[in-house]
């Protein structure tokens, strides 16, 4: 329920996005989130990263509750952090925030891409196949694969519109990832 209130608050302040500057604290939180993922973390490192992720999500929720998420960049930064959530509600919030970011700035390829990625992640959390083909999984044998995809859900034109690879490009990426191993 608390997450729902935060999303509703975010939706109410979204029209005010043209009135403020980007939130530097949210930007810094997002940079820290991404810095943890720059070098492929080993299994032992994920426990510490998960703790830092949880702390960052608390900070993002505080910024949302305080009404300090106003611009497309703010919503994008918040969404990127929230998509590393541990619960369905956090992933759903990430998708809502990414959708707002993409709506506020339809020309922002990163926001449109995150909208597709967060949707795929949300579907997978519900044990449903992803639509856009943005989520990869590493099997016990160390090989990468695309997580299950409903290939009939969207077209490659839809994927291009949301700035994600076509299905053929996503499948090709699996080979690249496995060769880089």
Which residues are covered by each model-predicted region?
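Cleavable N-terminal signal peptides
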Residues: 7-8, 18-19
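N-terminal signal peptide c-region/cleavage motif recognized by signal peptidases
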Residues: 14-16
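Amphipathic alpha-helical repeat scaffolds of TPR domains
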Residues: 22-43, 70-84, 108-124
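Helix-turn-helix repeat elements of alpha-solenoid scaffolds
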Residues: 47-59, 88-91
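TPR/TPR-like (Sel1-like) alpha-helical repeat modules
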Residues: 92-107, 136-137
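Bacterial N-terminal signal peptides that target proteins for export
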Residues: 1-7
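Terminal, low-structured helical/coil segments at or just beyond the last alpha-helical repeat
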Residues: 71, 112-181
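Alpha-helical solenoid scaffolds that mediate protein-protein interactions
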Residues: 60-63, 67, 101, 108
């Amino acid at each position: 329920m608390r997450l729902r209130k935060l999303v509703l608050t975010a939706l109410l302040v979204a029209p005010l996005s043209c009135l403020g500057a980007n939130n530097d604290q949210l930007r810094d939180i997002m940079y820290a989130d991404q810095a943890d993922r720059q070098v492929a973390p080993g299994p032992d490192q994920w426990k510490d990263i998960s703790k830092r992720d949880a702390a960052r999500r608390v900070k993002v929720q505080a910024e949302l509750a305080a009404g300090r998420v106003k611009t497309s960049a703010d919503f994008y930064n918040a969404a990127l952090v929230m998509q590393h959530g541990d619960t369905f509600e956090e992933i759903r919030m990430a998708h809502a925030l990414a959708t707002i970011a993409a709506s506020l700035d339809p020309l922002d390829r990163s926001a449109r891409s995150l909208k597709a990625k967060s949707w795929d992640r949300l579907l997978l959390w519900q044990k449903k196949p992803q639509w856009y083909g943005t989520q990869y999984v590493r099997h016990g044998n160390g090989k990468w694969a695309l997580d299950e995809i409903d290939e009939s859900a969207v077209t490659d034109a839809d994927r291009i519109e949301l700035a994600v690879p076509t299905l053929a490009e996503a499948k090709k990426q699996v080979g690249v990832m496995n060769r880089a191993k």
